[in-house]
């Protein structure tokens, strides 16, 4: 295939697709250029069906640092494991693509997205999502797409498609929505307490914008698309299925309706084990034993799937006996742990999360160095899901994609209500430990996080609660479920997580297993979620009515002082000499950010106050009409130099010493004297003139004497000059004669 180029304009930026030139051995490959972001997407499929009971789809998103003209960090100077952002982007692409493959498709599929050049104003993740769909669509892989996705922002009351970097920074909404022609099938969002109405409008606007991208993909597929491969789908033997259903369906129905999770699992497992043992014995010598037993396992899964859905849609009964809009029993507790900076335990039915708060100086913030400019991440929310939470053994090690994704969702939900850095100069870390799980553990971790923050004295704007909504749909009729449990998530069609305050939504996440959902379902789910969210907020507020006024005794003491940006170098000093001297003197820890916010950390409040005084003195500037008690540090023929504060001197001319004529400064003052002076002038070079007589009453009948010419002699004495090499920015040390 020769190179072909397709071009359009989307959201004000050029969108160019190239095919037939690179990665030609892949089943499908495209180069997508959006603005100046360039992504290569290659899709490949295995020749044979994989073993296992799931579809082995793998989506990768690789950030190459050369794309932004940067060297990779670390000693190796080479890209290693994906960053958290890259992992989240891969999940973002996987989720809308996965439902678009046929039921029973088991061939392994890999979709690899490589960012080759990066433009911060043109979303590389959205280019990768577009490229992933298109690479699959033009390939021979049996993909029932296309899909597409867009980002939606909300700036000054206006919804914006694919906002640029400046618009993103000003936006109250960070929404990614994906779908096909008929419906939305993936949502990921953080928001600053926006209403359900605004969120729904944003979702619909995003879906409308997607249509343009879908049309563009269809044009390309029509021009270069391959014929789809004829692959084997996993299908069970219908006669075997009918036989097992007839013999064991009644037993499975009874097992599924056991309300308690562990007892229900025991009951369903007993039925499964009976069926499996029966057919293992029956077909032990059969030449297709492996295929038959694979079918038996698949049939049992289908039977349970069918019965759970039938109970909900026909009998209007959920496996645990709840109504469709009913939340499981709730319980909340704070101060579960001693010595930590804050803790909250939240239980919803058989799902339980413990959240633990840790506060630290800003020096502990995480430095993020990716394709964007390096920045410091102040708030971290980590989610851990040990296997004991579901009563089983399993992998134990570093967090996987699911744990990273759930942690990020909680982070988005809670960061919207955190106090500003100026009001609360701490790095904040929340760790959610899932202790029990029967569905919706990510939302339990959000609610537990709110409890921990409030108990720890972090002045959040409002409590945040989370709830997971589900859906059972047969294509014509549907039922929206509130607070889905594990079985409803596993056999249902939707997992729609909504977190927020009483004033609005702070985070959304939606994954579905069908082609898409309609605006009507979205609206109904958002309304039910709001009602449920308020019920959970009632429990939070009954447990801890307001944020505690003080931090935990074990939490670090931190205070701040704001300085001008151009004064930062004065506080730091040459080679860090000044700040090191302050730290050595007071025993504190000091962090200074690029905006001039100085955070001072110490367990000793007196040390913090002393440090603030020192820094305030270093950056202090005298003002005209300000009055000081100043020490005389040097005498000249034309006047006296006095120290106003720290390293700041002023000249008191002999004519400003008294209302009467003064011939020599030493007639009135000596070095070491302390005198009251008033600042009367600061010239454009920063030189300060002060007056003693301005603070004295003017004699009656006073006549202004003729002024003498001001000497042009340098105002700094010899010792100042000798210290020139030890300056801190524009700041000079001087010695004070103590004789």
UniProtKB/Swiss-Prot annotation:
Q: Where does the record place Basic and acidic residues bias?
A: 722-739
Show the segment(s) annotated as Disordered: 699-739
Q: Name a single GO biological process.
A: RNA processing
Q: Would you tell me the Gene Ontology cellular component terms? A: cytosol
> What is its subcellular localisation?
Cytoplasm
Which GO MF term does the entry hold, naming one? polyribonucleotide nucleotidyltransferase activity
Needed co-factor(s): Mg(2+)
- Full protein name: Polyribonucleotide nucleotidyltransferase
Instruction: Name the species this protein comes from.
Output: Streptococcus suis (strain 05ZYH33)
Source taxonomy: Bacteria, Bacillati, Bacillota, Bacilli, Lactobacillales
């Amino acid at each position: 295939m020769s190179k072909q180029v397709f071009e359009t304009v989307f959201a004000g930026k050029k969108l160019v697709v190239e095919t037939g030139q690179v990665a030609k051995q892949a089943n499908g490959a495209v180069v997508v250029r959006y603005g100046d972001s360039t992504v290569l997407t290659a899709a490949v499929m295995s020749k044979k069906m994989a073993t296992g009971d799931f579809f082995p789809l793998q989506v990768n998103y690789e950030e190459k640092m050369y794309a932004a003209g940067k060297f990779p960090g670390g000693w190796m100077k080479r890209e290693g494991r994906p960053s958290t952002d890259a992992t989240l982007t891969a999940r973002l692409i996987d989720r809308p693509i996965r439902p678009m493959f046929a039921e029973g498709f088991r061939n392994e599929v890999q979709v690899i997205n490589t960012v080759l050049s990066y433009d911060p104003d043109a979303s590389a993740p959205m280019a990768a999502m577009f490229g992933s769909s298109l690479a699959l669509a033009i390939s021979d892989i049996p993909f029932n797409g296309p899909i597409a996705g867009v980002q939606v922002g909300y700036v000054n009351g206006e919804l914006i498609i694919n906002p640029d970097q400046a618009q993103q920074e000003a936006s109250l909404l960070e929404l990614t929505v994906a779908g096909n022609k008929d419906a939305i099938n993936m949502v990921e969002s953080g928001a600053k307490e926006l209403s359900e109405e605004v969120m729904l409008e944003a979702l619909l606007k995003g879906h409308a914008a997607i249509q343009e991208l879908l049309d563009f993909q269809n044009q390309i597929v029509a021009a270069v698309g391959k014929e789809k491969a004829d692959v084997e789908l996993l299908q069970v033997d219908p006669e075997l299925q009918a036989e097992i259903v007839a013999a064991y369906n009644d037993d499975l129905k009874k097992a599924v309706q056991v309300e308690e999770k562990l007892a229900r699992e025991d009951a369903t497992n007993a039925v499964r084990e009976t069926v499996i043992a029966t057919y293992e014995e029956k077909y032990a010598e059969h030449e297709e034993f492996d295929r038959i037993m694979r079918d038996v396992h698949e049939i049992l899964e289908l039977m349970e799937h069918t019965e759970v859905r039938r109970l909900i849609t026909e009998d209007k009964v959920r496996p645990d006996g709840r109504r469709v809009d009913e939340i499981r029993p709730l319980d909340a507790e704070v101060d579960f742990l001693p010595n930590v900076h804050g803790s909250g335990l939240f239980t919803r039915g058989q799902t339980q999360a413990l959240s633990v708060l840790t506060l630290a100086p800003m020096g502990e913030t995480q430095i993020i160095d990716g394709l964007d400019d390096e920045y410091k991440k102040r708030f971290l929310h980590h989610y851990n899901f040990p296997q004991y939470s579901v009563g089983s053994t399993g992998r134990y090690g570093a967090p996987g994609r699911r744990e990273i994704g759930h942690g990020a969702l909680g982070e988005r939900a809670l960061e919207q209500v955190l106090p500003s850095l100026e009001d609360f100069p701490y790095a904040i870390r929340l760790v959610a430990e899932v202790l029990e799980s029967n569905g919706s553990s990510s939302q339990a971790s959000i609610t537990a996080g709110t409890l921990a923050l409030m108990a720890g004295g972090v002045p959040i704007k409002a409590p945040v609660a989370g709830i997971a909504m589900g859906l059972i749909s047969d294509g014509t009729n549907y039922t929206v479920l509130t607070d889905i449990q594990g079985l409803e998530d596993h056999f249902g069609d939707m997992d729609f997580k909504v977190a927020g305050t009483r004033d609005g939504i702070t985070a959304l996440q939606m994954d579905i297993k069908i082609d898409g959902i309609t605006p009507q379902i979205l609206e109904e789910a958002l309304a039910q979620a709001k009602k449920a969210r308020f019920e959970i907020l009632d429990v939070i507020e009954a447990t801890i009515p307001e944020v505690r006024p003080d931090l935990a005794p074990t939490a670090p003491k931190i205070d701040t002082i704001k300085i001008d940006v151009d004064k930062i170098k004065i506080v730091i000093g040459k080679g860090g000499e000044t700040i090191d001297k302050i730290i050595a003197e007071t025993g504190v820890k000091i962090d200074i950010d690029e905006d001039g916010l100085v955070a001072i950390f110490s367990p000793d409040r007196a040390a913090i106050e002393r440090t603030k005084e020192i820094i305030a003195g270093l950056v202090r500037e005298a003002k005209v009409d300000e009055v000081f008690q100043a020490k005389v540090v040097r005498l000249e023929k034309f006047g006296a130099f006095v120290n106003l504060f720290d390293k700041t001197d002023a000249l008191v001319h002999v004519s400003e010493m008294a209302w009467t004529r003064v011939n020599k400064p030493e007639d009135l003052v000596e070095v070491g004297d302390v005198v009251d002076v008033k600042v009367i002038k600061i010239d454009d070079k920063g030189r300060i003139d002060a007056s003693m007589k301005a603070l004295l009453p003017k004699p009656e009948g006073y006549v202004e004497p003729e002024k003498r010419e001001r000497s042009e002699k340098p105002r700094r004495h010899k010792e100042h000059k000798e210290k020139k090499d030890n300056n801190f920015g524009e700041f000079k040390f001087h010695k004070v004669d103590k004789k």
